[in-house]
Amino acid sequence: MSYSNILVAVAVTPESQQLLAKAVSIARPVKGHISLITLASDPEMYNQLAAPMLEDLRSVMHEETQSFLDKLIQDAGYPVDKTFIAYGELSEHILEVCHKHHFDLVICGNHNHSFFSRASCSAKRVIASSEVDVLLVPLTGD
């Protein structure tokens, strides 16, 4: 089976390059499309900050996340069609984006080594609820 519209869930970590490389290896032979989704930290979890500071911090975090995605795309050696930066529960956003944009494969990474950690990760929630195929890629740290 070939996949032509792939969504890659990345984190702002170097291991995300492995996920994008996997997506490129799947998409390139069929000239498929790749999009990225990531989660930006929500500064509201730092509730001791005043409201005006929260908005400034949210803007900075969004810019840093976008810069990371831009660098990841630049190094990919293959075009990336869309990027999505989500706030909140990543698995919910992945499912929503898949439905709206008709992705046929979601690629997620897993660097958790214990069974308990794997059972509680966002990827498990995506796998349980997804209407499209999900590829869980084991990640190796540098």
From Swiss-Prot:
Its main location: cytoplasm. It is found in: Cytoplasm. Keywords: Cytoplasm. The lineage of its organism: Bacteria, Pseudomonadati, Pseudomonadota, Gammaproteobacteria, Enterobacterales. The gene is uspC. This is Universal stress protein C. It comes from the Bacteria. Induction: During growth inhibition caused by the exhaustion of any of a variety of nutrients (carbon, nitrogen, phosphate, sulfate, required amino acid) or by the presence of a variety of toxic agents. Positively regulated by guanosine 3',5'-bisphosphate (ppGpp) and by a RecA/FtsK-dependent regulatory pathway. GO terms for molecular function: molecular adaptor activity; protein homodimerization activity. Belongs to the universal stress protein A family. One of its GO terms (cellular component) is cytoplasm. It comes from Escherichia coli (strain K12). InterPro entries: Rossmann-like_a/b/a_fold, Universal_stress_UspA, UspA. GO terms for biological process: cellular response to starvation; cellular response to UV; response to salt stress; response to stress. Required for resistance to DNA-damaging agents.
